[in-house]
Regions:
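Nucleotide-sugar donor phosphate/pyrophosphate-binding loop at the beta->alpha transition
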Residues: 98-100, 109-128
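Donor nucleotide-sugar binding/catalytic pocket of nucleotide-sugar-dependent glycosyltransferases
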Residues: 124-170
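Short alpha-helical donor nucleotide-sugar binding micro-motif in glycosyltransferases
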Residues: 130, 230-231, 238-243, 324
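Conserved donor-binding/catalytic core segment of Leloir-type glycosyltransferases
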Residues: 174-207
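Nucleotide-activated donor-binding/catalytic signature segment of Leloir-type glycosyltransferases, i.e.
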Residues: 216-234
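Aromatic "clamp/platform" in nucleotide-sugar-dependent glycosyltransferases that forms part
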Residues: 251
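Short hydrophobic beta-strand element within catalytic cores of glycosyltransferases
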Residues: 259, 264, 268-271
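A charged, aromatic-enriched C-terminal amphipathic alpha-helix characteristic of glycosyltransferases
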Residues: 302-342
Length: 352
């Protein structure tokens, strides 16, 4: 089986969507499934308004068609609702090709925070985008319930995993900082609600790993906080393993893969009781969720690092990949995905 995933989020971006897609492809290959990507690479781009450090592609119809037809996939999945996602959707609609989508980012809330455009407008746009899909994949029960209440249909599950070989507690970084260390990691941007963490009265040291448009402002405002910049690979793992508590202040993520990455490093998580933490942490003894984030941070201190690690060991990317592939396989050929007689680049396309 050959799957094409269209995504606006791609390297060199460092975020949960990119990590999810690359981990999915690696695990799917081990199951005998090839995943190709339609990405912004090779297209003209422009800086995203209000976030110039993040660039968005400007795809053209002919090149989109050329790339898809060169791959000739058995199934098409659209992972993002940016220009690449809309272009892939338009291609499928023109040719009556079935496709699935996933809901991974709260763009309506992001846009509202940055521009003041009501989230209700954004959700109307996203309902239209996803309505044409054979299935909208979501990662958690709480997100499925929320989107269902907002009028989204044909919702299915695709959970997330963690690379427990990469993320492990074996070699924590030697941080010469007062303990306990409360750490957050991710894009330093207003929609991540990092200031809710930085403003807390906590013992020890607060540490921020990551970069983004709000970093300079927050460094000036909170000089006592240690900003370490972007970390990758083993360097990231060692820093997560060095923390006493991982703090996840975001209220706009749809899952928060970094929670599993911290847990795999043996680090308990503190978070607000919102989609993502409610599903990952819940009432497991691996962290604390509370509307009072300070209380959650202090309660998470001292939780068993071994329990955190064991919890993560049960969440593999292979299981996530099996679920994703199963969603696509279930749609062929008895539902909307059926082989067509049109052969492109030596492979058979799918037509709905």
């Amino acid at each position: 089986m050959r799957i094409l995933i269209a995504t606006d989020a791609w390297h060199p971006q460092v975020n949960g969507v990119v990590r999810t897609l690359t981990s999915l492809a690696r695990s799917a290959a081990g199951l005998g499934v090839d995943i190709d990507f339609l990405t912004p690479d090779g297209f003209p781009s422009m800086g995203l308004p209000t976030y110039p450090g993040l660039r968005i592609a400007l795809p053209n119809r002919r090149e989109i068609a050329k790339r898809i037809e060169a791959i000739a996939p058995d199934a098409i999945h659209i992972a993002t609702e940016g220009p690449i996602g809309w272009a892939a959707r338009a291609y499928c609609r023109r040719r009556k090709l079935a496709f699935t989508t996933s809901y991974t980012t709260r763009f309506p809330e992001y846009v509202e925070v940055r521009t003041g455009i009501p989230a209700s407008v954004g959700y109307a746009v996203l309902r239209h985008f996803h309505a044409a899909a054979s299935m909208i994949m979501v990662a958690t029960d709480s997100l499925k319930a929320e989107l269902g209440a907002r009028g989204f249909k044909k919702l299915g599950f695709w959970t997330r995993g963690v690379d427990t070989d990469l993320f492990n507690p074996d070699s924590p970084a030697e941080l010469d900082l007062p303990r306990p260390i409360f750490m957050t990691m991710g894009r330093v941007a207003v929609e991540k609600n990092i200031e809710a963490f930085l403003s807390l009265n906590l013992p020890g040291t607060k540490v921020v790993v990551g970069d983004g448009p709000q970093r300079a402002e927050l460094e000036r405002k909170y000089p006592q906080v240690k900003f370490l910049g972007e970390k990758k690979g083993q360097d990231l793992t060692s820093h997560l393993a060095a923390a006493d508590v991982f703090v996840f202040p975001s209220k706009t993520d749809t899952f928060g893969v970094v929670q599993l990455e911290a847990l795999a490093c043996g680090t308990p998580v503190a978070a607000f009781p919102v989609t993502g933490p409610l599903d990952v942490i819940a009432d497991h003894p691996i962290g604390a969720i509370d509307e009072n984030l300070q209380s959650a941070c202090l309660r998470a201190l001292g939780m068993s690092r071994e329990t955190c690690r064991n919890f993560a060991l049960e969440r593999s990317w292979e299981n996530s990949a099996r679920q994703f592939i199963g969603n696509l396989t279930a749609l062929q050929p008895s539902r909307s995905l059926r082989p067509t007689s049109r052969v492109v680049a030596g492979r058979t396309a799918v037509r709905g």
